[in-house]
Amino acid sequence: MSAPEEMTLKVIAHIRTAFPTKFGIPRQSGLVDSLRGEVIFTPEYRNADAVRGLEDFSHIWLVWQFSGAVRDSWSPTRMGVFATRSPFRPNPLGLSSVQLEAIEHRPDVGPVLIVRGADLMDGTPIYDIKPYIPYADCHPDAAAGFTAQTQFHHLTMVCDAGLWA
């Protein structure tokens, strides 16, 4: 028996973040640990049993859709589509590792995952959540391809306190 060539994914949750548009979102998860988000489950998964045991993990994987960057085609440039993390993909799915800060049980929406370091736009559909397992998910000797040349720059922002009044 062979697997089908296509499948339908079910949205299990949406994330609430401070980013109403794609502009300003960090390019990778974990780059800005202070960014807080809330994963709100769809009614079918608003059940404490769905997250039982997740509280024992410090990090989780979010599988999500690039809902704000959908395009029919990919235009090749310097790298092939599968050598990049571009949102313009045959299947516009994203994968983010985020810190699980807490699980709050709210009477109106059930369990809510409080996460840090998410790189997702507000309202992004979540298709799956998996625990981050350090011995299997971390590969310290992994080759980084073209990203090994990435330079990190720290910026200091100075703002007149009078502007906040």
Feature names for model-found ranges:
Residues M1-S97, E101-A165:
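Glycine-rich, low-complexity intrinsically disordered segments
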